[in-house]
Amino acid sequence: WPGGVGDKKLGANYAPCVVPQREAMGRGFQQNLWLFGEQEYVTEVGTMNFFVALRNKETGQKELITAPLDGTILEGVTRDSVLSLARERLVPQGWNVVERKYTMKELDEAANEGRLIEAFGSGTAAIVSPVRHISWKGKLINCGLKDHEESGEIAAKMKEWIEARQYGDDEHEWSYIC
């Protein structure tokens, strides 16, 4: 059924992912990028929420984009932290933070046009996990990382900012030292 229970933390959402995950690993990848429907809407990567940073095709403005909470993805606590930090710290630098449906075709087009800046997953265990390449329809899409880079600038900043709050280095209402 459309959407299913993708917005719930259920074993039923994880068990069917084991075989595709093993297939991805057999092809040299660490995770699967989950696409939804005939339109191939980008949803999540592995068990993490997925973000892309790119330049808007019409305006050239930098955007941090993630799928909306429409019932198909988990409302991740780290996703919420990334969005909050992006609105607090990236928007004043001219970024636009967007929750909307976007397709794999759109992501591929942005990469081909040199507008894809970076991509990463976010989740409780990893905090952020940079994405180097996406294999789609027989081609390898470069997600903006150079050969010598392990992380893009936004993913690195998000990890740094979240850990600073987790460890009490950045005083914030999210953190309480007991």
Predicted regions and their residues:
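Helix-start/capping segments and mature chain N-termini
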Residues: 1-178
